[in-house]
Amino acid sequence: NMEHPGVEDFYRLPVSGGTPEKLTTMKGANEVTLSPDEKWLAIRFSFINKPWELYLQENKSGATPQQITNSVSEEFNSYRWRTPEVISFKNRSGNEVFARLYKPVNADPNKPAVIFVHGAGYLQNAHYWWSQYFREYMFHNLLADKGYTVLDIDYQGSSGYGRTCRTNIYRHMGGADLNDQVDGAKLLVEKYGVNPKAIGIYGGSYGGFMTLMAMFTQPEVFKAGAALRSVT
């Protein structure tokens, strides 16, 4: 993730040290296995709106990967899945926070929005590959179809952003991580024209816990919430 925290590439580095040489070219996640003779790369690749497929590429910089599997159905391809923007904003502490933003083509007149809180705390979801939250990704497409703006935040405690981000919630869960949701709601209002009286929040597991904390402690920000399989 040298180029962006939401992109995974494969690099070659001499044993003696030096400058890493990037071998992969596809933006997303590249999970690489070397062939026994080290002449080929087997790449398990996905993008935001494209599930995992297998590619083969020569083990050299600039080589063109060739797709060798096609696993999705005609039904899947019949829908125009969105590529949400991967954005970043500064939270109240000055930390850069990454998020996925789904913008409706035809916004509901009430300008509503939904904030999604991923689970575990230590996961990463504001990235450029196919999410393990693919069901929520599909739901967010539906919400955008219905005129909602959706924000999916990698809040404090999420993985992929270094030690400080991971430890900012130490001994105070529902503090700095919840602040990021509130700051995200503020961003939606100030930058994207969302109605401040029409913002909801939802999530499962740790995201359910965060939803409960939001509803109990920030009712002036979030007008509705759905806490799924909450950690209590």
Predicted regions: what is each one?
Residues L23-K27, N70:
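Surface loop/turn motifs at the tips and blade-to-blade linkers of beta-strand repeat domains
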Residues R12-V15, S78-Y79:
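Flexible, solvent-exposed coil segments and beta strand-coil junctions
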Residues E31-T232:
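Serine-hydrolase catalytic core recognition
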Residues P14-G18, N59-G62:
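Short loop/turn segments that connect beta-strands within beta-propeller blades
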